[in-house]
Amino acid sequence: MRPSSRAALSALALVIVSTVSVEAQRTSPVALDLREDIEQVEKKLIDLARAIPEEKYSWRPSPGVRSVGEVLLHISADNYLMPSAIGFPADAASGVKGDDYNTALAFEKKTMNKAAMIAELERSFAYLKKHLSDTPASKMAQPVSMFGMSITGQKAWILTTTHLHEHLGQLIAYARSNGVVPPWS
């Protein structure tokens, strides 16, 4: 084989390998769909948090059940916890670490006013969405350990999304129990 042919084949092989590597790193279509859904839930949660009067943030439907404010802090804590559990760096400012659920529980016990809770909710969603967007398609099928289970990265992100919907529904019920109509209704 002539040197020029070898150089051409080497260049072609490099392009093919580079293309495959870039393709494996692209964001998963599932992650893109989940991000769109999370953005809709985020808007509703933040709009609802703003609509509920601050004096109702301590309201709870019965003893032993999270209050409005505790639900908002729980959502924020889990928005930090989930990406960290999937393997992304923990958010140092939050103190929540994926390998230590007690850090999420401690976060939920913080004392904050309404404005601070909403700001924390917004910051936690920015962290969550950044790491969802940074999840390459190749990582979605890889196993991760979450809450003692071995699941795929994709399932972990789906659980994260369904968790947000669960608490949106909870806060809608809390709001309506207190005479607050969700702003989008």
State the predicted function of each range:
Residues Q25-S28, V96-K110:
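Acidic/histidine-rich, surface-exposed loop or edge segments in extracytoplasmic proteins
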Residues M1-S10:
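Bacterial N-terminal signal peptides that target proteins for export
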Residues S10-T19:
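Bacterial N-terminal signal peptides
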Residues L105-P143, T152-H163:
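Acidic/histidine-rich alpha-helical segments that form the ligand environment
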Residues R35-I46, K56-N102, P143-S185:
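Short, contiguous alpha-helical
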